[in-house]
């Protein structure tokens, strides 16, 4: 790139930026104007000086000796006759029509009763189909009924224990005879403890059921991975060495928006080279679908695309398209691709900006699709790697150690009616185009408009159309990156929170499979559990205050012989507390046991992986209350209509400044201190039960800052703490990504917009990638304007005739 040279400010400096010999520059040094220079570069007469720069675009692009642009026939002419780069394949449009959402069951019922029916569905080439009854469907239904019984049974038993722990039993302190003869305040004071207890018991039941679901998912995942006898795993459908037929073309699409350009194209290049090494590159095309609206980044993307094509000889295989109108964010970006080029491909693999996939993984996904004709989506389990901050490395360790259990457990319960996470997955193109286009949600407010979290919805629509959605949890070669620090992760969580709350409006949409209704529910509970937990703690504190401050009444009746003593069952409290701890932390212990059984060398050895697990558990305890408060605020913000910003996440290691941490965590620290003082004043012994919450809140500032430090993360890696196999023995794709990222940052293009105007090569590239759509648009506007003029004249003439 030309970043090493200063921005040209004169004609001579402009010449210095051109890759020419000294003799060639000497020949052009006599030019007195830029128009004359461009005319001589183009080697053809230019009648309009304003068009001189455009005339020399082709020459400026191909000045480099042995330039591949001409060899690859990448130069063409657009609709206005200007030279352009063939950055995209020819457009062959396919109809993409979203079905309007009918979310109101009352309206649907009324239309059915009145005989009006519902609006017709969009027409497709073939109707949605139901697959033949397969054995895995019956097995999946039975398994999910068992899961429901286990969750509810556990919750009922725990709720019974919780009821026995609470201090006020059986409405014994309320006299029904006295209620009619006492004031409203007296009645409220008597009823308040029981109202608080009932609310606490209800919240406890919901939260315990949520924890129970995670426990049984992890437990079944542990058994699946330990035995290795999963006969329903999708990865067993292919032998792995079948030739991919010529017609099974796959598009790898990477939607990006204002991303870290060096990292994006480093991962893309590593993936491209890995696919090329398999010998099946002719079955794949790569698309970078940009929604970038920052001009400097957009120019850098164009140059990075040209560089990676030249370095990999990827012209005609790696394409770049930037949208001018960012409709429907990422889902709209994919819709636009499907509409233009989707009909040319049988499959599509969606990548995130930080995704890297091996060629073996990608070719295996295509083979699995070919071997499973009823599969609509096959999702891989991406492995997190590539970050160096202490926070990111602990999260990488957690996802690498605990994640396989939960992913395998999800597969055990869901089978072919599973999740799609929006990236690192292969999609069957035809049913996706016909059934998975997303219409905006009807209505107004924060939960209307374009769908934000599109992945769960697309999976639900694919299953509704009769296609399977699978998780290939044991397929290696799929990688992603995590946010570098807590605050960046929380920014991402706010977007996901809003998107999941929006998706719940589709819970009762007609035709959705019960499993995907449950997916919508679990998506909401991922964030709604935070305010429920917070309210549970607040109500528990309120009950403590009532129990402490209200004068106890031991005799309700005038001649009552025996007092009514408050009840306390410490054995039930200890049993319930121990059970909850087991449900929360046993999956982590099982993960480490599985690593011991399979081999702990890649995690630093048995001792190091065990110590890392204990440190991660401590860290998760410290962060859980912090996330609780943030997620509570996110949920309230969504219901209050506060917009969530959808900026690109931080992709590079970045530490949190102390000022930023104080600003974000200061209110939490103050809340934790005040809460601790209040509980200590009410009942000092109860503070021990609340200590994990209030201490974590008071330590949130230093924990957030210290965990974001890169030097601590690197030191932990050197000592083999929080080590993952991708660091112990990194695959070639990750090695290449790191190397290319370093090289790209060294040559990163700065001041892209200015260079696109004054730098000869950047200007030529920007002109060659510009479209002539504005020309056709001007003609269209002229036609519309002329028709409107004729119409207005006709109206005036008819009006004059009537008046006459």
UniProtKB/Swiss-Prot annotation:
Q: Name one GO cellular component term.
A: plasma membrane
The EC designation for this entry is 2.4.1.-
Q: In which pathway does it act?
A: Glycan metabolism; osmoregulated periplasmic glucan (OPG) biosynthesis
Q: Name one GO biological process term.
A: glucan biosynthetic process
- Which CDD domains does this entry report, sorted A to Z? Glucan_BSP_MdoH (cd04191)
Which superkingdom does the taxonomy of this entry point to? Bacteria
- UniProt cross-references to InterPro entries, sorted A to Z: Glucans_biosynth_gluTrFase_H, Glyco_trans_2-like, Glycosyltr_2/OpgH_subfam, Nucleotide-diphossugar_trans
Membrane spanning residue stretches = 146-166, 200-220, 519-539, 576-596, 610-630, 686-706
Keywords attached to this Swiss-Prot or TrEMBL record, sorted alphabetically, are:
Cell inner membrane, Cell membrane, Glycosyltransferase, Membrane, Transferase, Transmembrane, Transmembrane helix
Look up keyword Lipid biosynthesis and say if it applies: no
SUPFAM superfamilies in the cross-refs = Nucleotide-diphospho-sugar transferases
Cellular location of this protein?
Cell inner membrane
Query: Its family?
Result: Belongs to the glycosyltransferase 2 family. OpgH subfamily.
**NCBIfam families listed in its UniProt record:** PRK05454.1-1, PRK05454.2-1, PRK05454.2-5
Instruction: List the HAMAP family hit by this protein, alphabetically.
Output: MdoH_OpgH
Protein name listed in UniProt: Glucans biosynthesis glucosyltransferase H
């Amino acid at each position: 790139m030309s970043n090493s040279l200063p921005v040209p400010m004169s004609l001579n400096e402009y010449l210095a930026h051109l890759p020419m010999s000294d003799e060639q520059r000497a020949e052009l040094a006599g030019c007195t104007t830029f128009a004359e220079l461009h005319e001589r570069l183009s080697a053809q007469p230019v009648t309009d000086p304003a068009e001189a720069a455009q005339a020399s675009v082709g020459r400026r692009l191909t000045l480099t000796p042995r330039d591949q642009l001409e060899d690859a026939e990448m130069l063409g002419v657009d609709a206005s006759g200007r030279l352009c780069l063939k950055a995209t394949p020819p457009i062959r449009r396919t109809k993409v029509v979203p079905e309007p959402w009918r979310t109101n069951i009352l309206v649907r019922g009324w239309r059915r009763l009145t005989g009006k029916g519902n609006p017709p569905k969009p027409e497709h080439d073939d109707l949605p189909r139901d697959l033949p009854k397969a054995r895995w469907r019956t097995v999946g239904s039975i398994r999910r009924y068992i899961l429901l019984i286990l969750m509810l049974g556990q919750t009922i038993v725990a709720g019974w224990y919780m009821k026995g722990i609470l201090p006020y039993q059986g409405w014994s302190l309320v006299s029904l005879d006295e209620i009619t003869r006492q004031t409203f305040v007296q009645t409220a004071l008597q009823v308040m403890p029981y109202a608080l207890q009932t609310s606490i018991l209800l919240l406890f039941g919901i939260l315990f059921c949520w924890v129970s679901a995670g426990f049984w998912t992890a437990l079944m995942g542990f058994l699946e991975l330990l035995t290795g006898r999963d006969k329903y795993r999708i990865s067993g459908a292919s032998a792995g060495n079948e030739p991919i037929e010529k017609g099974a073309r796959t598009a790898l699409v990477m939607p990006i928006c204002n991303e870290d350009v060096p990292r994006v194209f480093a991962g893309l290049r590593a993936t491209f080279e890995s696919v090329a090494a398999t010998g099946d590159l002719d079955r794949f095309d790569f698309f970078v679908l940009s929604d970038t609206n920052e001009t400097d980044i957009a120019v850098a993307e164009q140059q990075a695309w040209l560089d990676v094509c030249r370095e990999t000889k990827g012209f005609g295989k790696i394409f770049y398209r930037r949208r001018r109108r960012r409709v429907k964010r990422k889902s709209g970006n994919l819709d636009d691709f499907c509409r233009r080029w989707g009909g040319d491909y049988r499959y599509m693999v969606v990548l995130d900006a930080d995704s890297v996939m091996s060629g073996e993984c990608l070719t295996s996904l295509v083979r699995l699709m070919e071997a499973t004709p009823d599969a609509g989506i096959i999702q891989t389990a991406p492995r997190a790697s590539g970050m160096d901050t202490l926070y990111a490395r602990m999260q990488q360790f957690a996802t690498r150690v605990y994640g396989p259990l939960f992913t395998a457990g999800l597969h055990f319960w869901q089978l072919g009616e599973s999740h799609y996470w929006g990236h690192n997955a292969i999609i069957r193109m035809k049913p996706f185009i016909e059934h998975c286009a997303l219409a905006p949600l009807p209505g107004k407010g924060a939960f209307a408009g374009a769908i934000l979290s599109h992945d769960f919805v697309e999976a639900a629509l694919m299953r509704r159309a009769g296609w399977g959605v699978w998780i290939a949890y044991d397929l290696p070669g799929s990688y992603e990156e995590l946010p570098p620090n807590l605050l960046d992760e929380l920014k991402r969580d706010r977007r996901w929170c809003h998107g999941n709350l929006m998706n719940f409006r589709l819970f009762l949409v007609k035709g959705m499979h019960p499993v995907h209704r449950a997916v919508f529910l679990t998506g909401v509970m991922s964030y709604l559990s935070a305010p429920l937990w917070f309210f549970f703690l607040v109500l528990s504190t309120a009950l403590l205050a009532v129990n402490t401050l209200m004068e106890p009444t031991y005799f309700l009746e005038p001649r009552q012989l025996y007092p009514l003593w408050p009840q306390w069952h410490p054995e039930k409290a200890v049993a319930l507390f121990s059970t909850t701890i087991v449900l929360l932390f046993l999956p982590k212990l099982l993960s480490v046991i599985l690593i011991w059984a399979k081999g702990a060398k890649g995690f630093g050895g048995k001792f190091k992986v065990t110590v890392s697990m204990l440190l991660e558990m401590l860290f998760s305890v410290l962060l859980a209350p912090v996330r609780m408060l943030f997620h509570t605020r996110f949920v309230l913000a969504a219901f209050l209509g506060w917009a969530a910003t959808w900026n690109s996440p931080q992709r590079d290691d970045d530490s949190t400044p102390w000022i930023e941490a104080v600003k974000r965590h200061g209110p939490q620290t103050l809340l934790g201190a005040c809460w601790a003082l209040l509980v200590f004043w009410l009942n000092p012994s109860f503070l021990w039960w609340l200590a994990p919450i209030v201490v974590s809140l008071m330590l949130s500032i230093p924990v957030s800052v210290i965990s974001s430090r890169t030097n601590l993360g690197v030191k932990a890696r050197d000592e083999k703490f929080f080590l993952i196999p991708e660091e112990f023995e990194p695959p070639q794709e990750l090695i290449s990504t790191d190397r290319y990222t370093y090289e790209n940052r060294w040559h990163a293009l700065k001041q892209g917009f200015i260079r696109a105007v004054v730098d000869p090569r950047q200007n030529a590239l920007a002109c060659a990638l510009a479209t002539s759509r504005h020309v056709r648009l001007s003609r269209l506007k002229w036609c519309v304007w002329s028709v409107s003029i004729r119409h207005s004249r006709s109206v005036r003439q008819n009006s004059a005739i009537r008046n006459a």
